[in-house]
């Protein structure tokens, strides 16, 4: 039974439907999550521009619905204008709601830092323009992006249809391109990565920080609930 004192975690998700990403129920089955959807049309800078100004309004909606903390669960949506913008967006959400707020870009940074990663191989769903912006964001934050392999997807629905074997192969190619990396960043919150993470870590011997699992891990930590993630989904979630 859910403790009535357990903080509700609010999530702003890029797709239109107000659905909590499936990773939440697998990783933290006892925690309460709620969501509101931005209705982003494409995984491109133009798609981000169309919805970014509504993020703060969605944060306020989640507060009205009882959220105690809020996460913007979009990686590229929060890094595409750079590190300073990610911080400013987080501050704007906090100022409007008075609640602790975070973003998925902050989550992956926190995950990489928790694992003492300095040099990171990039495995992404994105087109080249977005990959370049991700590399620049990581460099601004003091990390060394090392190589990149990507799927070149722009469709929101297509992200969720990428299968586990494709994700594992993508990560293998990323580490082959940058074999001296400390970890792999598997970037895009729309990818279903939970089953790929343990296989990649077993095969390659390096940790994987993936957008959506890291987003849940970070939001739960911010909420201060003390809940632990379900086991078997990689080093970060087992830390």
Predicted regions and their residues:
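Conserved beta-alpha
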Residues: 93-156, 237-239
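General beta-strand structural signal in soluble alpha/beta enzymes
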Residues: 71-72, 101-105, 147, 186, ...
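Short, flexible loop segments at boundaries between secondary-structure elements
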Residues: 153-158, 204, 208-228
């Amino acid at each position: 039974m859910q403790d009535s004192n357990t903080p509700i975690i609010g999530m702003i998700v890029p797709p239109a439907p107000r659905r909590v990403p499936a990773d939440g129920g697998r990783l933290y089955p006892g925690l309460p999550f709620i969501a509101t959807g931005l209705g982003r049309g494409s995984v491109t800078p133009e798609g981000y521009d169309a919805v970014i100004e509504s993020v703060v309004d969605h944060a306020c909606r989640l507060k009205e619905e009882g959220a105690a903390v809020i996460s913007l669960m979009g990686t590229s949506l929060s890094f595409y204008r750079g590190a300073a913008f990610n911080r400013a967006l987080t501050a704007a959400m906090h100022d409007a709601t008075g609640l602790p707020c975070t973003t998925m870009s902050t989550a992956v940074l926190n995950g990489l830092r928790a694992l003492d990663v300095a040099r990171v191989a990039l495995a992404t769903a994105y087109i080249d323009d977005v990959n370049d912006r991700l590399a620049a964001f990581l460099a601004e934050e003091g990390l060394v992006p090392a190589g990149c392999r990507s799927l070149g997807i722009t469709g929101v629905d297509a992200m969720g249809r990428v299968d586990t074997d494709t994700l594992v192969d993508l990560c293998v190619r990323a580490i082959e391109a940058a074999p001296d990396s400390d970890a792999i960043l598997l970037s895009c919150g729309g990818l279903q990565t939970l089953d790929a993470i343990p296989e990649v870590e077993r095969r390659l011997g390096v940790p994987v920080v993936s957008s959506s699992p890291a987003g849940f891990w970070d939001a739960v930590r911010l909420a201060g609930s003390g809940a632990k993630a379900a086991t078997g989904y990689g080093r970060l979630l087992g830390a």
